[in-house]
Amino acid sequence: LNTACTSAANGLLYGARMLAADLYRRVLVLAFETPSAIAQQGFGALGLVSPSGEYRPFHPQRDGLVLGEAYAATLLALEPGPAPLARLLGGFSACDTSSLTNTREDGSHIEWVMREALHSAKVSAGQIGLVKPHGTATGANDRAECNGVRRLFGDALPPLCVLKPWLGH
């Protein structure tokens, strides 16, 4: 499964769906991002890679993303073992078809996806203690994410944690 930045999250959602459909008792989700010349050239051609190499999402002097490397494995099960580390309450994924490489800068699509995810998890926006945005450190994406988060949370913004260089694209 490759859905670019959302591959690992979509892997978790698909795994959860397989469990809910009673296809499996356990699902192992493996995710990785390995730096490659193809990725670097692709993002470079789009003008998204930081020429300075400094990662500054949501900063006035941001100049693009810094690609990272990460590997992860998560075992999903309907019946947790003796010490589960986390619970997947729900989630939602969608593509913004308004553009091939961007999302709507007004944040409406991002807000909609977050609302659907909260609804799926049966959680309210007020219960969220941390938001991990996409964080490409590009003007259009930063504006879209800021607007989407602001539309959902209003003035009660939870902290943001951006991890792209440490978790990969």
Predicted regions and their residues:
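Active-site-proximal alpha-helical scaffold in enzymes
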Residues: 1-31, 67-82, 169
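Short pre-catalytic strand/loop immediately N-terminal to key active-site residues, enriched for Gly-Thr
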Residues: 1-3, 59-63, 160-169
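Conserved beta-ketoacyl condensing-enzyme motif
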Residues: 1-3, 35-40, 125-143
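Acidic, glycine-rich active-site loops and adjacent beta-strand->loop/helix elements
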Residues: 3-7, 31-36, 92-96, 135-137, ...
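Stable alpha-helical structural segments in soluble proteins, enriched in small hydrophobic residues
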Residues: 7, 11, 113-121, 152
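Acidic-glycine-rich active-site phosphate/pyrophosphate-binding loop
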Residues: 40-52, 144-160
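Condensing-enzyme catalytic core mediating Claisen C-C bond formation in acyl metabolism
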Residues: 53-121, 129-130
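Short glycine/threonine-rich loop-to-helix capping motif typified by GTGT followed
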Residues: 100-106, 136-153
